[in-house]
Amino acid sequence: MPVESVTVESVDGVRLDAAVHTTSGPVRGTVLLVHGITVDMDEGGGMFVRLAGQLAAAGFNVVRFSFRGHGNSGGTQRGVTVAGECLDLEAAVQLVEERFRGRFSIVAASFGAVSTVLSLPWLATRLDRLVLWNPVLDLRATFLEPELSWGKENFGPSQQKLLHENGALVVDGEFELGRVLFDEFTHYDPLAGFLDSTVPSLVVHGDRDTAVSYEIAARAAQSRPHTMLHTVVGSDHGFDSREREDEAIAMTVAWLVEQIALSS
């Protein structure tokens, strides 16, 4: 399937790296892929590249992009903020709407769910379906008062001391996050935003996730109308084997194909 590398610009002037996959068959719809924190538009292990290929083969046009401070996009790691990612998502949506007609769907992974869910009030009239992979829905439980081992290791007392003293901490020894982002975590509530929305949704989550709570996501999915939960049994965050990655991809493609058929 043809893949075109493009550049878009957020409203505050940050250049964003993006890719457009155009289906060669009859068009079912368009899907925007929104990656998690510390990775880029390929998503960990290239999952979004493989997902985009399978979606294009199934008749979907696909757009991927890297948030500011990630991949080849402009900005810095330390300058990553929730507000900035919301602006980047807005720019990516504009690219989708410039290239392809009609409503579109979003697949958002991990921290990508935060900007996506917070944007649902203005996305509502544009969005057809929503898929969340291992979504961060509770910022306090993930970052501020971490309940799981990955969060305790990366955002525990010693790391918080570094954040206070130096204005930043380093996640997994390789990605720098600044204090402004952590200040934002006290103000935003993506879980409430997800529960307030009525867009039909699929949540795909591993039940052995050590970074982002499976239980919080599962409860949200089960209490929300028009929402399906698919549990990847035994999987850690990001789907920790090729087999589990393939399961998440296959489930996502099949659900989107089915949903488009139901709505047509």
Language model: regions and residue ranges:
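N-terminal cap/lid segment of alpha/beta-hydrolase-fold proteins
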Residues: 1-29
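Aromatic pocket-lining residues of Rossmann-like dinucleotide-binding sites
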Residues: 55, 119-120
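Glycine-rich nucleophile elbow surrounding the catalytic serine of serine-hydrolase chemistry
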Residues: 108-118
